[in-house]
Design a protein with these regions (language model features):
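Secreted glycan hydrolases and related glycan-binding modules that recognize and/or cleave
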Residues: 1-301
C-alpha cells in the first residue's frame, strides 16, 4: 500500500441548478470517492459530470442503496432468495450501464434499519461480489482493476467482510482519539465486523442545517487544543498506529459554505473544512499511487 489516505463523501446530487454546491463537478478536486446518496438519474448532465470526475480528476463515483423495502425481513417473504438474486443482478446491470465505479451498501440493522437473515444478505453479496469488489471474477476487471464494493453503517458477518473494499464508519460527533479507537477492529463500537483497520474510513455528518459541520464538526481534542472533528479524523488517519484508510463526510454539500446554509458566505475556499482534511492526510505535492481500484468507463452522450 502507498501512504495515500482516502477521502470519501456521500452527496445528495441535484443537477437542476447551476450552483456548484449541488453539482457533482463542484466537489473538491482531490476527493477520492463520492457516492450518490439519493439515487442516480441517467440523463446527459449527470453522465457529463460523472465522466468529468472520472477522466479529469480520477474520482470514483458510486451509487448508495439499501436493501429494498419489498424484501421482507419477517413473515412469508423473508427468505425470498430468488427475488434477491434478480434485484442484485438488476442493480449491477444499472451500475455498469450508467458507467459508475461501484456500489455502496447502506446497512444499519441495529439503528432502525432492516435486518435481513444471514442467508438473504449473503445471497445479495454473492451476486454483487461477482461483478464488484476484491473478489470479483477476473472477466469483470479492466487492466487488473475492479469496480468498488463498499458497505457503510454496520456489518456483522465477519466471514463476508473480505468481499468489500472498505467499511465506511459513521463516526459522527467524534470528540477524541479514544472515541475513534473504540470504532476500530475489536473496539466496543466496532460496527464493521471482520474489517481490518486499514479498510476502514471514518466519516463526520453534515446532513442538516444547524449542525456543527458548518465549522468542520464538533470540538475534537488534539494536541492539547480543540480542532474540528473532521480534521481530527484526518490526523487520526495519518498519525494513529491503527492506520485506518481515511476519513470523509455524509452529505458533503452541506459543508460547502460556513454554517451549513446556502446563503452564508463561503470560507476562503468552498468546502474549506473538507479541503483542509484532505490536505492534512495528503499534503500537496506528495506523489502517491492510486488505491481506488475502479475502472474508467466510456459514457455515451
Amino acid at each position: 500500500n502507498s501512504d495515500h489516505k482516502i477521502f470519501f463523501a456521500w452527496m445528495n446530487y441535484s443537477p437542476a441548478t447551476s450552483s456548484m454546491q449541488t453539482r457533482l463537478r463542484g466537489i473538491p478536486d482531490s476527493l477520492d470517492i463520492v457516492s450518490f446518496f439519493t439515487g442516480y438519474v441517467n440523463n446527459k448532465q449527470n453522465r457529463e459530470d460523472v465522466k468529468f470526475l472520472q477522466e479529469r480528476r480520477g474520482t470514483k463515483v458510486l451509487l448508495t442503496m439499501w436493501p429494498d423495502k419489498y424484501f421482507a425481513t419477517t413473515g412469508e417473504g423473508r427468505e425470498d432468495l430468488d427475488s434477491m438474486i434478480v434485484y442484485a443482478e438488476n442493480l449491477v446491470d444499472s451500475i455498469y450501464t450508467w458507467g459508475l465505479d461501484g456500489f455502496d451498501l447502506d446497512y444499519e440493522p441495529s439503528f432502525g434499519g432492516d435486518s435481513y437473515t444471514t442467508e438473504m444478505m449473503r445471497t445479495f453479496i454473492d451476486v454483487m461480489s461477482k461483478y464488484l469488489g476484491p473478489k470479483c471474477d477476473e472477466q469483470y476487471k479492466v487492466n487488473g482493476k475492479h469496480k468498488l464494493l463498499v458497505v457503510d453503517g454496520q456489518w456483522n458477518d465477519a466471514e463476508y467482510a473480505d468481499r468489500f473494499d472498505y467499511f465506511i464508519g459513521q463516526a459522527y460527533n467524534a470528540s477524541s482519539e479514544s472515541s475513534l479507537n473504540n470504532r476500530c477492529q475489536d473496539g466496543w463500537q466496532d460496527y464493521g465486523k471482520g474489517f481490518p483497520n486499514e479498510k476502514r474510513i471514518f466519516c463526520e455528518w453534515v446532513s442538516q442545517v444547524g449542525n456543527a459541520f458548518g465549522q468542520g464538526g464538533v470540538n475534537y481534542r488534539y494536541d492539547n487544543e480543540y480542532i474540528p472533528s473532521l480534521w481530527g479524523m484526518a490526523h487520526y488517519a495519518v498519525e494513529s498506529p491503527k492506520n485506518v484508510a481515511g476519513c470523509g463526510a455524509y452529505v458533503l454539500q452541506f459543508g460547502y459554505a460556513e454554517g451549513n446554509h446556502l446563503n452564508l458566505p463561503v470560507p476562503p475556499n468552498n468546502y474549506y473544512y473538507a479541503r483542509q482534511a484532505i490536505q492534512i492526510m495528503n499534503p500537496a505535492g506528495k506523489t502517491v499511487e492510486d488505491e481506488t481500484d475502479g475502472e474508467e468507463v466510456e459514457v455515451e452522450e
